């Protein structure tokens, strides 16, 4: 299954088509940045871009499974948006924009609506909450994908939806991820009880990024972290 079909007219095996898709994504991304700037806001904050580039660098080094941990209201969504853009426009890590999947175990229509509104239009159908993953099964030729599990501590226990989706699609198998060029990032506000325990994998197979906040920094007020989300 395709996560969306916005780029179906492009053949991703053809270099010129891939380049045209990258140019289109850059155009749309930059226009969204300009739109937010006109409102006196930022689409992606420097801190968010930094963490997304750290994760992208791990992908470039052959890592296929990553964990990003940041406090509630810090701005994980911005990191996700930046990472999606970087992966889909990178010359070193090829991700098919039709195969972006952003899911959560929450049954929350508001989360889905808000997340879609933050994304460029062509990628909005990539967003799914609990009901969208209950029976999700990838095609046999599914590859070149980025799968993002937001708030991965939710519905991740045995026999729950997200974990069952992972097992059904062999996403715990690092060899399978490497062979198919599937990259996974799980986000959470706590390093405990995440979907994929980093301790189950050696460091060369898993990258973990944890945001450390200095709450004594006057430039990092509660309002700042609310705005950055």
Where do the protein language model's features map onto the residues?
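Short basic/glycine-enriched coil/helix segment immediately N-terminal to the Walker B
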Residues: 63, 95, 134-145, 176-179
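Conserved interdomain linker/interface between the two RecA-like ATPase lobes of SF2 helicase motors
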Residues: 194-229
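Short, conserved "post-DEAD/DEAH" coupling segment immediately C-terminal to helicase motif II
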Residues: 155-182
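Structural recognition of the conserved hydrophobic beta-strand(s) that form the central parallel beta-sheet
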Residues: 102-103, 148, 181-189
């Amino acid at each position: 299954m395709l996560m969306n079909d916005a780029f179906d007219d492009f053949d991703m095996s053809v270099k010129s088509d891939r380049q045209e898709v990258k140019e289109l994504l850059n155009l749309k991304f930059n226009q969204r940045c300009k739109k937010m700037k006109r409102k006196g806001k930022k689409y992606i904050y420097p801190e968010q871009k930094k963490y997304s580039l750290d994760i992208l660098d791990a992908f470039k080094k052959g890592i296929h499974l990553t964990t990003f941990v940041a406090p509630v209201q810090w701005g994980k969504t911005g990191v996700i948006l930046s990472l999606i853009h970087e992966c889909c426009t990178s010359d070193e890590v090829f991700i098919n924009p039709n195969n972006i999947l952003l899911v959560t175990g929450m049954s929350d229509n508001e989360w889905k609506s808000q997340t879609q509104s933050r994304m460029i239009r062509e990628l909005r159908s990539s967003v799914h909450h609990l009901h969208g993953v209950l029976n999700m099964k990838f095609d046999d030729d599914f590859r070149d994908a980025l799968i993002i599990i937001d708030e991965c501590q939710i519905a991740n226990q045995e026999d729950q939806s997200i974990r069952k989706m992972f097992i059904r699609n062999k996403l715990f198998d690092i060899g399978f991820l490497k062979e198919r060029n599937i990259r996974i990032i799980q986000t959470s506000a706590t390093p405990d009880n995440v979907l994929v325990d980093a301790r189950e994998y050696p460091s060369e197979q898993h990258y973990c990024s944890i945001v450390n906040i200095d709450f004594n920094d006057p430039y990092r007020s509660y309002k700042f972290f609310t705005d950055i989300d």
